[in-house]
From Swiss-Prot:
Allows the formation of correctly charged Asn-tRNA(Asn) or Gln-tRNA(Gln) through the transamidation of misacylated Asp-tRNA(Asn) or Glu-tRNA(Gln) in organisms which lack either or both of asparaginyl-tRNA or glutaminyl-tRNA synthetases. The reaction takes place in the presence of glutamine and ATP through an activated phospho-Asp-tRNA(Asn) or phospho-Glu-tRNA(Gln). Heterotrimer of A, B and C subunits. Gene3D superfamilies: 1.10.10.410. The gene is gatB. It comes from the Bacteria. GO terms for biological process: glutaminyl-tRNAGln biosynthesis via transamidation; translation. Belongs to the GatB/GatE family. GatB subfamily. GO terms for molecular function: asparaginyl-tRNA synthase (glutamine-hydrolyzing) activity; ATP binding; glutaminyl-tRNA synthase (glutamine-hydrolyzing) activity. Keywords: ATP-binding, Ligase, Nucleotide-binding, Protein biosynthesis. This is Aspartyl/glutamyl-tRNA(Asn/Gln) amidotransferase subunit B. Its EC number is 6.3.5.-. It catalyses: L-glutamyl-tRNA(Gln) + L-glutamine + ATP + H2O = L-glutaminyl-tRNA(Gln) + L-glutamate + ADP + phosphate + H(+); L-aspartyl-tRNA(Asn) + L-glutamine + ATP + H2O = L-asparaginyl-tRNA(Asn) + L-glutamate + ADP + phosphate + 2 H(+). The keyword Protein biosynthesis applies.
Length: 500
């Protein structure tokens, strides 16, 4: 659909109520796969981290990964879910090249966790409670690479390659209940929800949750209901959403696309759709299947999972501080205003800020550098700020500023030098000769020259108009190439003005 066929977003919200639902797939950090002893790690040569179980070869039998079960229970508890005293695996039957067995071992009517909720903080600081229907265990599928098509898509591809290294990797799929009431903030809620899930699994230590690697993937369901109709619309499920920004953009696009179709008297097809980051659009995939289409039946080769009450309580006691509670604590400890803390949260750099403070930096200084200069450089280079420089490196720059070795202006140059791989903060200072001049001699020479060049300013200072000293201070800082402490320069300017 062309951009011109999209309805204006505000107009779409006036006419329709968006109804949301999310399925978030979290790859678990375990040594081996869900049902085999094949190693579980990202990368590796294609089709090397596999066993007969992963390929569904005759005679091979699955064995449940105990650590994956524990991780799944921990996640369920963190989501406020009830943990099932007995849950069962099921075969989800469908045919696709990345599924060697032609079925996926998942869970159907007896998931490991159910009926929970998660608090989501919106950009304006409001808390929205998102209902969780269930969290269930399953194995991942392989990965297809389409050759010859545009930007790796299947459309127009000459052929496809399949890598089964990912097949059998343990997953937890978190399924929300129907989410009403998001209104015009539906895209922002979608982004905030996925961000919250990412924060939770990282805090638990059960997943790297790197969306660019597929550790965490989101399928976003969206339908529109005409205002006042009281009826649910036909939903679409948008797949291939692999960044927080994409989640927000995909929801906004689908609302505009569906609204345009409905307003023109058309109907929405229940289907999966694929998000394309390069075009900012979704495209039709396949008709959306219902549960009956997958012909679920109990997995005959696996016994039910029946965790003891003692194990559940042991895992509950080991849960870390919830991310939402942690954020409130940090805000109070750091003394940030609501606006300052929200700025950090919205930047996605809270973890980096925490690590920088733990490395010895003052919270306000850490906030200023991460959300200011470092974010500016990251935006200019089109990369994630967290990939540019480490919290320890930032803390070392802040330490040099606090010690008086650097001014803020010089520190910006040092930050760029560290980012460009010129060495540690101190090494960049030494190599570039950026340290603040601590000897008053060169400062006095520059001040005297500036005063002589601006006799009118000198006269004003002598008459008690000390604010006029700013012109001299600026000239001195320029002459010293910023390598001077402005406060010390001001003191000396006032002294020399009266003495000359």
């Amino acid at each position: 659909m062309a951009k011109a066929e999209l309805m204006d977003y505000d107009e779409a919200i006036e006419m329709f109520e968006p109804v949301l639902g999310f399925e978030v797939h979290v790859e678990l950090n375990t040594r081996t796969k869900m049902f085999s002893d094949a190693p579980n790690f990202f990368g590796g040569e294609p089709n090397t981290n596999i066993t007969p179980v992963d390929l569904g070869l005759p005679g091979s039998l699955p064995v449940v990964n105990e650590q994956a079960v524990k991780h799944s229970i921990s996640l369920g508890l963190a989501l406020g879910c009830e943990i099932a005293p007995s849950s069962r695996f099921a075969r989800k039957n469908y045919f696709y090249p990345d599924l060697a067995k032609n079925y996926q071992i998942s869970q159907f009517d007896e998931p490991i966790a159910f009926r929970g909720s998660v608090e989501v903080e919106m950009p304006d600081g409001r808390i929205v409670t998102v209902p969780i229907e269930r969290a269930h265990m399953e194995e991942d599928a392989g990965k297809l690479t389409h050759v010859g098509g545009a930007t790796g898509r299947i459309q127009g591809a000459d052929h496809s390659l399949v890598d089964y290294n990912r097949a059998g990797v343990p997953l937890v799929e978190i399924v929300t209940d129907i989410i009403y009431g998001a209104e015009g903030e539906a895209p922002e809620l979608a982004k905030a929800y996925v961000s919250t899930i990412r924060d939770i699994v990282v805090a638990l230590g059960i997943s790297d949750a790197k969306m660019e690697r597929g550790n965490l993937r989101c399928d976003a369901n969206i339908s529109l209901s005409p205002r006042g109709s009281g009826k649910l619309g036909t939903r679409t499920e948008t797949k291939n959403v692999n960044s927080l920004r994409s989640v927000e953009r995909a929801i906004r696009y689908e609302i505009q696309r569906q609204a345009a179709i409905l307003a023109a008297g058309g109907t929405i097809t229940q289907e999966t759709r694929h998000w394309h980051e390069d075009t900012g659009r979704t495209s039709a995939g396949r008709p959306k299947s219902d549960a009956d289409d997958y012909r679920y039946f109990p997995e005959p080769d696996l016994l039910p999972v029946q965790p003891s009450a003692e194990l559940i309580e042991e895992l509950r006691a080991a849960l870390p501080e919830a991310p939402a509670i942690r954020r409130r604590r940090l805000k109070a400890e750091w003394g940030f205003t609501d606006l300052e803390f929200q700025d950090v949260v919205n930047s996605g750099l809270l973890t980096e800020l925490v690590d920088t403070v733990e490395a010895g930096a003052a919270p306000q200084a850490a906030r200023k550098w991460w959300t200011g200069e470092i974010a500016r450089i990251a935006n200019a280079r089109g990369v994630d700020a967290a990939t540019l420089i480490s919290p320890t490196q930032v803390a070392s720059v802040i330490e040099l500023v606090e010690a008086g070795t650097l001014t803020n202006r010089l520190a910006r140059d040092v930050i760029e030098g560290v980012i460009d791989g010129e060495g540690t903060a101190q090494e960049v200072v030494d190599a570039r000769g950026l340290a603040v001049v601590s000897d008053d001699g060169p400062l006095i020479e520059a001040i005297d020259a500036a005063l002589q060049a601006q006799p009118d300013v000198l006269a004003k200072i002598r008459d008690g108009k000390v604010q006029a000293a700013g012109a001299v201070i600026g000239a001195v800082m320029k002459a010293m190439r910023g390598q001077a402490d402005a406060a010390r320069v001001r003191e000396l300017v006032l002294e020399r003005a009266q003495a000359s």
